[in-house]
Curated annotation (Swiss-Prot):
Domain note: The PTS EIIB type-4 domain is phosphorylated by phospho-EIIA on a histidyl residue. Then, it transfers the phosphoryl group to the sugar substrate concomitantly with the sugar uptake processed by the PTS EIIC type-4 domain.
GO biological process per UniProt: phosphoenolpyruvate-dependent sugar phosphotransferase system
Organism, scientific name: Lacticaseibacillus casei (Lactobacillus casei)
Name of the protein: PTS system sorbose-specific EIIB component
Function of the protein: The phosphoenolpyruvate-dependent sugar phosphotransferase system (PTS), a major carbohydrate active transport system, catalyzes the phosphorylation of incoming sugar substrates concomitant with their translocation across the cell membrane. The enzyme II SorABCD PTS system is involved in L-sorbose transport.
Gene for this chain: sorB
Residues annotated as transmembrane: none
Length: 164
């Protein structure tokens, strides 16, 4: 499997993803990795309907994503991974999927989260997950839209939450 793009964006498939990021990725398929969405049949149906024309969409949990990645049937498939949170990205990488770079696009503000940029709000688990991804060698790219300059999420985390 060829990973062309991996992105954390809790809105998953929306305007920016369908018009810009999916084209930028040049992928054959979007794989949404989310145990929460995987269990929600209505949300799965809506996300598949929102996909760009001609783009295949699969919604899986982490164990299924790892199994599919390791299936020789998909070795030449170009995929765009979408996640709702960084913890599942950590689980994927620890499960043996080599992820070089992760784009962080949008993580909405909710109670218990702290806003670190115009579109990204984090809680302690998110912070720990991003720090762990960095330690695992994943390059972190904070950019909501393609034309935004890349921003150092770890510097923002240290500024807002303090250094580790």
């Amino acid at each position: 499997m060829i990973i062309t793009l991996a992105r954390v964006d809790d809105r998953l498939i929306h305007g920016q993803v369908t018009t810009v990021w999916s084209k930028e990725s040049n992928a054959d398929r979007i794989i949404i990795v989310s145990s929460e969405v995987y269990k929600d049949d209505i949300r799965k149906t809506l996300l598949k309907q929102a996909a760009p024309p001609g783009m295949k969409v699969n919604i899986v949990d982490v164990p299924k994503a790892i199994a599919v990645y390791n299936n020789p049937k998909y070795q030449n498939e170009k995929v765009f991974y979408l996640f709702t949170n960084p913890r599942e990205v950590v689980d994927l990488v620890k499960g043996g999927i080599p992820l070089e770079k992760l784009n962080i696009g949008g993580m909405q503000f909710k109670q218990g989260k702290t806003q670190i940029s115009k579109a990204v709000s984090l809680d302690a688990d998110d912070v720990a997950a991003f720090r762990e991804l960095h330690q695992l060698g994943v390059k972190l790219d904070l950019r909501v839209v393609k034309t935004d300059p890349s921003s150092d999420i770890l510097a923002k985390i240290d500024e807002v939450f303090g250094k580790e």
